[in-house]
Structures are given as C-alpha cells and as structure tokens.
Swiss-Prot record:
Catalyzes the condensation of carbamoyl phosphate and aspartate to form carbamoyl aspartate and inorganic phosphate, the committed step in the de novo pyrimidine nucleotide biosynthesis pathway. This is Aspartate carbamoyltransferase catalytic subunit. It comes from Clostridium botulinum (strain Hall / ATCC 3502 / NCTC 13319 / Type A). One of its GO terms (molecular function) is aspartate carbamoyltransferase activity. The lineage of its organism: Bacteria, Bacillati, Bacillota, Clostridia, Eubacteriales. L-aspartate binds at residues 83, 165, 228. Keywords: Pyrimidine biosynthesis, Transferase. Pathway: Pyrimidine metabolism; UMP biosynthesis via de novo pathway; (S)-dihydroorotate from bicarbonate: step 2/3.
Length: 307
C-alpha cells in the first residue's frame, strides 16, 4: 500500500511496489478516460526551487489529467523563499492547502527535510546532483514498455556522470534487477561518484567498466543513456566549455550499435545527441518524455490512495 508514502529515493519502493506503479501506468496508457476524475478535489503543490520544463509540466499535466488541480511556484523569488523562509516552514504551510507536493531543490537532501516536517506525501523532483526518482520511474517504465523486461541488460551511461542525478538514480534502480551490467563513458573529471561505484555496484558484485571512447562499447549496449554536461553545476566556465562537447552521439557512432538498442535522454538536450538521431527508431527520448507523464499520473494516484 503506497497511500501516504513519500518518494525521495528510487530505493524507497520495493520491486513489487514499483511494479504496482508500472501496472497502473499501463492501465492509464490503455484507457486514459477511466482516470479523468480520480483526483477530483485534490491539489498538487509544485515547489520548484530550480528551473524545469519537462518535470514540472509533466507533474502538472499528470495531475490535471487525473482531474486534480495544481498550485505552486517555478521561481523561488516569487514566493516567501525570497524572504528567507525555510523548507520546513514552506512545506508545513503548503500542507494546509495541498494534498501532495513535488519538490525540486538545488540542495541535496532538501526534499527529505521537507518530508520530515510534512503531513502530506512529498515527491523528490530532483535534489541537486543527488537523486531524481521520478525520472528513474520514467526511465524504467520506458525500458519495460519497449524492451519487455528490466533484467539482463547492458546499460551504457554517457556524459556527465558526476553531477547527473538521473544517472545516479537509474544505476541504483537497475542494479536491483537481475544480470544487469553497466558501461560508464565520461571525461575523467565527470566520472561516476565513488558512492555509486562502491556502495551500489561493488558491494553487490554488479559488473561494470569505465571507458573513454563511446565507439568501444556501442556494439554491446542494449540501452544508451545520454546526458548533457550541466553548465549550472560548474563553478568555472572554462571547465564547462572544455568538457561540454566530450561525447556527441551521431549517425556514424550509431552504425556500431545493435538494431534494437534504445537511446534514452532525460532532456533537455544541448548538442550531445545529433538531430539526425531523432529520425532513427532507436532514438526513444521523446517517447520517454511521454511515459514520464503517465508514470507520474500513476504515482500521484497511488500516493493519494485513489487507486
């Protein structure tokens, strides 16, 4: 039973609970008209302390398509945060008006702090370079829907693996399924963090390798998860400029890939995936964005206990 729970980390739900959410998402995709009023009278608060397009719109569209309503902010300067209000006080106040909250914050752990003080379910919509569990649910539903399984996969993660919270969450989640292995492709400065390598992979004897050339791994990958180098995570503009074009996926590199490989990307894209890949059936990132709305619909319905 997920009613009243928080989602702060992809490990918060068991595999059985994740499957509950995915099966409900399947039902919503199949017959969306059946869910048009399940959240009548319910309100979602979107508390976005960082810019967002897909995640915020996806949450808002999800709640509206369930018949609920949305309040919130997408720019903290337009709220009492600008006056110095704490996360704890913000969530306490929002809990007086809303039934569930989605929070994005630049500081790692901020949604967890909010959950400690909240009387309503809190969903982590991304905290700094830490975790992004609803993007992970999106990624898992996309893979499950298009591949048919979440096990026995070779997953390549490419780009900014140090600051890329979507990668951290995805590796944690996919490490729970059988016989998955990982290939990490990044500049030396943007390698996967030690805590992922040691606490998730090595501790659980999960096979992985780190390489520098994308072409060296393309032929073995079932999934290629691309990420952008995130300008907003750099303190030094010169470092960003030097690293931003490190890995670019184009048609030439795709020649090495399996015919049924999937290219995923949490978006936004800058230049790390050439536009020619949009016409390749293996480019699944816009399908992935749509699955994000459906999985958030299912998650909201489950946490509110309306399904």
């Amino acid at each position: 039973m997920l009613k009243g729970r928080n989602l702060l980390d992809p490990m918060d739900f068991s595999l059985e609970e994740l499957e509950e959410v995915f099966k409900l998402a399947d039902e919503i995709i199949e017959e969306p008209e059946k869910f048009l009023h399940v959240c009548d009278g319910k309100i979602l608060a979107t508390l976005f302390y960082e810019p967002s397009t897909r995640t915020r719109f996806s949450f808002e569209a999800a709640m509206l398509r369930l018949g609920g309503q949305v309040i919130g902010f997408s720019e903290p300067n337009s709220s009492s945060v600008a006056k110095g209000e704490s996360v704890a006080d913000t969530i306490r106040t929002v809990g007086c008006y809303a039934d569930i909250a989605a929070m994005r914050h630049p500081k790692e752990g901020a949604p967890a702090i909010a959950a400690m003080y909240s009387d309503i379910p809190v969903i982590n919509a991304g905290d700094g370079s830490h975790q992004h569990p609803t993007q992970t649910l999106t990624d898992l539903l996309t893979i499950r829907s298009l591949k048919g399984d979440l096990s026995n996969l070779t997953i390549g993660c490419c780009g900014d693996l140090k600051f890329g919270r979507t990668v951290h969450s995805l590796v944690k989640a996919l490490s729970r399924y059988k016989n998955n292995k990982f290939v990490f492709m990044s500049p030396e400065e943007l390698k996967i963090p030690d805590y992922i390598r040691k606490e998730i992979l090595e501790k659980n004897n999960i096979e992985y390798k780190e390489i520098s050339k994308m072409e060296d791994a393309m032929a073995e990958l079932d999934i290629l998860y691309m990420t952008r180098v995130q300008r907003e995570r750099f303190f030094n503009e010169d470092d960003y400029v030097r690293l931003k074009d490190s890995y670019i996926l184009d048609g030439e590199k795709m020649k090495y890939a399996k015919k049924d490989m999937m290219v995923l990307h949490p978006l936004p894209r800058v230049n790390e995936i050439a536009y020619e890949i949009d016409q390749d059936p293996r480019g699944c990132y816009f399908k992935q964005a749509k699955y994000g709305m459906y999985v958030r619909m299912a998650l909201i319905a489950k946490l509110l206990g309306v399904r």
